[in-house]
A protein has these predicted regions:
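Active-/binding-site microenvironments in catalytic and ligand-binding cores
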Residues: 1-189
């Protein structure tokens, strides 16, 4: 299992780690990672690993079995070796934009209080699909309300609740097709 450092500190831009596995496809698995894997419609982080006198570009990150976070290199030309200590660097501009779009979509789900059936995020835009029986009549009012929330400058925080607390408050989950991971005993809000 890879320790997902991004869950505790989304603003961590660099960190060291040790290579614990190199996949047959030359993917890299570290003991701990600041790279967020593709999940829930949000793209995985990209960046690079620095080791010795080398540098390995990471083009995306994905989830693997048993909690592994898989880093996908651009090429197989220059990779760290098993056991190497590497310095991780995420593409901070892209990560930060993903975070901003993600937060904006949470606000949109408040402005449109309907179940979410799908969505996607990029570093420049996002989309939510709603289970909407009919078209919304006043899009300008919705846009104005959303812009008010964004301009409000509210502090964004995260917290953790237990799986049992989430089960007791089903209204916290807006998505119909993607449920939060509940097998770990706690869920990040």
């Amino acid at each position: 299992m890879t320790i997902p450092l991004y869950l505790e500190d989304s603003y961590l831009k660099t960190c060291s780690g040790s290579v614990v596995e190199i996949g047959e496809d030359k993917s890299i698995i570290l003991d701990k990672s600041i790279f967020y894997p593709t999940s829930g419609g949000q793209p995985g982080d990209k960046g690079f690993l620095q080791f010795g006198s080398g540098r390995c570009e990471i083009v995306t990150t994905r989830k693997g079995e048993n909690g592994k976070i898989i880093l996908v290199p651009l090429t197989n030309d220059y990779l760290p070796k098993l056991g190497d200590t590497v310095e991780q660097f995420i593409d901070w501009e892209t990560r930060y934009n993903h975070m901003r779009v993600h937060s904006a979509l949470h606000l949109l789900s408040v402005v449109i209080p309907l179940p979410v059936t799908g969505g996607s995020i990029s570093d420049i835009k996002g989309r939510l699909d709603f289970n909407m029986p009919e078209s919304l009549s006043d899009k300008e009012e919705l846009e104005s309300h959303l812009n008010e929330l964004i301009a409000g400058g509210y502090k964004i925080t995260n917290s953790w609740i237990t799986d049992e607390e989430l089960a007791a408050q089903p209204g916290l989950v807006k998505t119909m097709s993607v449920k939060p991971p509940i097998e770990s005993g706690r869920v990040r809000l």
